[in-house]
């Protein structure tokens, strides 16, 4: 029987997984410095969680969700995005209570699932890095979230990225805008795509996100939400923009930006990368915004919230082109070679001692000839080769060779007891 991975999935092999680990660790370190803590939620949830949060008319729910009935007759869905599960956990575990400091800031790094056409940077199983902040409706919470996204891309070495930003206002603004869109699109309904005709009666805002060719001719003249914003929404949006100006963060106010999920309210944003070697036009690598009603939607108290998500596959595609130096194989610190009776166990002890000091170290479990061990040390990219023979074992010594310049050092076993002492002797 020939077995293959399902279409739209990828094996992340060891030569690549280290690159993912480096990106994820960079994100973890940044988020922790901002006092965000990791949250882990199930990879599958009840179907209604996503259908209610993402919107019944969204592409995610209508076309892309993996859902099924389990053996207990429950309607289950694999998570297509990270926010809904985090909100569910926030409500179910009563994190809105007084025992938790607000804003409650979390991040996640997890696999998601959408039935999409596989292409470069987009798979049916994909990975997302995200942050969510619950409990503050202040404009600085929006600014902080945007800055976290900006600073993460900067730390990773992403080039030519641009912040696109818009606001959807509150529920009253959305309703007024909804009515204006219905009035605009209804006379040309028969000329719209099938999807847009269906969405016109349910959520015409989704039409603005359409990629269908027949819809494009009507989008440029469609009403703009900025013309329907109330004074409070305008004031809040202007505070965010003024803060970004003062902080030196450039942005583009994008009237066409609506985001693909129905739960957004207030500010929304995307970071787009302009790289013609990757895409014909600028493409989104990070997106998010404010969602002040989703906690209530899941029977929690009124709770403002804001967050963003990054598709890792797309991010890795960008970094492989723009910052390949980040992924250069650093090899390992030490490879222990040995020859002679009794040296095998000592090689194991030396490797364990080096690891306890924080170094990466490997020895030859196959105990091949010394020449073969040296070849392996070179193949794994060792910075130093430790040689241990019967004579060295008897004298309590070992030889260390620095491969970058061939310099050799004679060390006592006791030199391995202290990291600073060891480094002082081999980094001369």
From Swiss-Prot:
Membrane-crossing ranges are none
GO annotations of cellular component type: cytoplasm
Q: Does Cytoplasm appear among the keywords?
A: yes
- Disulfide-bonded cysteine pairs: these are none
Per its record, the protein catalyses: tRNA(His) + L-histidine + ATP = L-histidyl-tRNA(His) + AMP + diphosphate + H(+)
Coiled-coil regions listed in the entry = none
Q: Which UniProt keywords apply?
A: Aminoacyl-tRNA synthetase, ATP-binding, Cytoplasm, Ligase, Nucleotide-binding, Protein biosynthesis
What EC number(s) would the UniProt record show?
Answer: 6.1.1.21
Localization annotation: Cytoplasm
Tell me which InterPro entries the record gives.
aa-tRNA-synth_II, aa-tRNA-synth_II/BPL/LPL, Anticodon-bd, Anticodon-bd_dom_sf, His-tRNA-ligase, HisRS-like_core, HisRS/HisZ, HisRS_anticodon
Q: What class of enzyme is it?
A: ligase
Give GO terms for biological process: histidyl-tRNA aminoacylation
GO MF assignments = ATP binding; catalytic activity, acting on a protein; histidine-tRNA ligase activity; transferase activity
Quaternary structure?
Answer: Homodimer.
Name used for this protein in its record: Histidine--tRNA ligase
Q: Which organism is it from?
A: Lactobacillus delbrueckii subsp. bulgaricus (strain ATCC BAA-365 / Lb-18)
Q: What is the lineage of its organism?
A: Bacteria, Bacillati, Bacillota, Bacilli, Lactobacillales
């Amino acid at each position: 029987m020939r077995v293959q991975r399902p279409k739209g999935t990828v094996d992340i092999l060891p030569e690549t997984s280290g690159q993912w680990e480096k990106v994820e660790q960079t994100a973890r370190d940044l988020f922790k410095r901002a006092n965000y803590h990791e949250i882990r939620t199930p990879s599958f949830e009840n179907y209604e969680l996503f259908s209610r949060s993402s919107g019944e008319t969204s592409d995610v729910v209508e076309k892309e969700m993996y859902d099924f009935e389990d053996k207990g007759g429950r309607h289950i869905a694999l998570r297509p995005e990270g926010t809904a599960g985090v909100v569910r956990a926030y409500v179910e575990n009563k994190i809105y209570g007084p025992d938790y400091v607000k804003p409650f800031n979390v991040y996640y790094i997890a696999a998601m699932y959408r039935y999409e056409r596989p292409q470069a940077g987009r798979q049916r199983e994909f990975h997302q890095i995200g942050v969510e902040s619950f409990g503050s409706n202040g404009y600085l919470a929006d600014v902080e979230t945007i800055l976290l996204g900006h600073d993460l891309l900067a730390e990773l070495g992403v080039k030519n990225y641009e912040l696109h930003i818009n606001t959807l206002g509150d529920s009253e603004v959305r309703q007024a805008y909804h009515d204006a869109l219905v009035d605009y699109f209804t006379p040309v309904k028969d000329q719209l795509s099938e999807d847009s005709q269906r969405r016109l009666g349910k959520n015409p805002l989704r039409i603005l996100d359409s990629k269908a060719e027949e819809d494009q001719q009507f989008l440029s003249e469609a009403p703009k939400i900025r013309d329907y914003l109330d004074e409070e929404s305008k004031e809040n949006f202007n505070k965010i923009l003024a803060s970004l100006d003062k902080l030196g963060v450039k942005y583009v106010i994008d009237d066409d930006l609506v985001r693909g999920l129905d739960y957004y309210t207030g500010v929304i944003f995307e970071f787009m990368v302009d790289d013609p070697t990757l895409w014909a036009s600028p493409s989104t690598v990070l997106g998010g915004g404010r969602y002040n009603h989703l906690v209530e939607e899941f029977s929690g108290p009124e709770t403002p919230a804001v967050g963003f998500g990054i598709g890792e596959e797309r991010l890795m595609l960008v970094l492989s082109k723009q910052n390949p130096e980040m992924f250069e194989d650093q090899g390992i610190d030490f490879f222990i070679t040995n020859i002679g009776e009794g040296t095998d166990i000592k090689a194991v002890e030396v490797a364990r001692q080096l690891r306890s000091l924080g170094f990466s170290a490997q020895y030859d479990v196959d105990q091949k000839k010394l020449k073969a061990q040296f070849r392996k040390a070179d193949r794994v990219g060792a910075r130093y080769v430790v040689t241990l023979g019967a004579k060295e074992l008897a004298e309590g010594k070992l030889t260390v060779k620095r491969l970058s310049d061939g310099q050799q050092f004679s060390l006592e076993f006791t030199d391995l007891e202290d990291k600073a002492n060891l480094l002082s002797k081999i980094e001369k």
